[in-house]
Amino acid sequence: MKLMNKIIVPVTASALLLGACGSNATESKDNTLISSKAGDVKVADVMKKMGKEQIANTSFSIVLNKVLADKYKDKVDTKDIDKDIKKEEKQYGGKDQFESMLKQQGMSFDDYKEQKKLSAYQKQLLLDKVNVSDKEIKENSKKASHILIKVKSKSSDKEGLSDKKAKEKAEKIQKEVEKNPNKFGEIAKKESMDSSSAKKDGSLGYVIKGQMVDSFEKALFKLKEGEVSKVVKTDYGYHIIKADKETDFNSEKSNIKQKLIEEKVQKKPKLLTDAYKELLKEYKVDYKDRDIKKAIEDSILDPDKIKQQQQQQSQGGSGLTNSGS
């Protein structure tokens, strides 16, 4: 989830610096990082340069990691995390290429695995703290497939058609699908310009309200199971949408619930900050530095500040989905 990833940053160089205060105490009792004839560089010197907000963010990330791991380690299966990482390695062409990509981002394989664990702990926290009823799940989700005919944003684009030709093609496909709804998947595989869904017979899986752009969502949620929409225009082109039969709803319910929780948190960050505050209180987290405490309360635990960060992130656009979650 992007919002939560924004708040819970990976342990970076500043975290290692904080760790130096304790882990290397036997090597340097006065916390000297570098010595020279011109003078020493101590942890305190660097921390002054870093600024309170950066120190607060990193300190909070470390303590939250410890607390979440203690509370939810028995609810997270590390084998599932290993399986996910194996899939990601395959997507990047193997373990060596995957680790090279991580290295370019300043992260080791072990750091990445820890971040994946933390993400799993976060999900457990929100499952505990954010209520989503079965009724909400039913009302706010729909299994969908689509066929997309892309419109070129500029004439030099390799993929897509002119607006006129794209619309004509979409209308022709829509009539064909309306006559033969059982062949939707076959037609999607052949005609759709959304390559990721085309190879799955056009399937988008379960779509959550608020997840897609407005015109797409409105058309989808008007459909009854098995129905096909008229041609729908979005900024990406022309779509033909189908409401699929929800034969796997029970097995997918937990995943749908997780998506709904993420959407709720995107819309109302206070749900997340309240969950953090309850957890910190439960674990008797005590801020020893008043400035650090204020920096954490004014940024990480302030839902309005999180909302601002969220809006800044969304300005870049995120494709067919609204939140990119």
Curated annotation (Swiss-Prot):
One of its GO terms (cellular component) is plasma membrane. It comes from the Bacteria. GO terms for molecular function: peptidyl-prolyl cis-trans isomerase activity. Its EC number is 5.2.1.8. SUPFAM superfamilies: FKBP-like, Triger factor/SurA peptide-binding domain-like. Belongs to the PrsA family. This is Foldase protein PrsA. It comes from Staphylococcus epidermidis (strain ATCC 12228 / FDA PCI 1200). The gene is prsA.
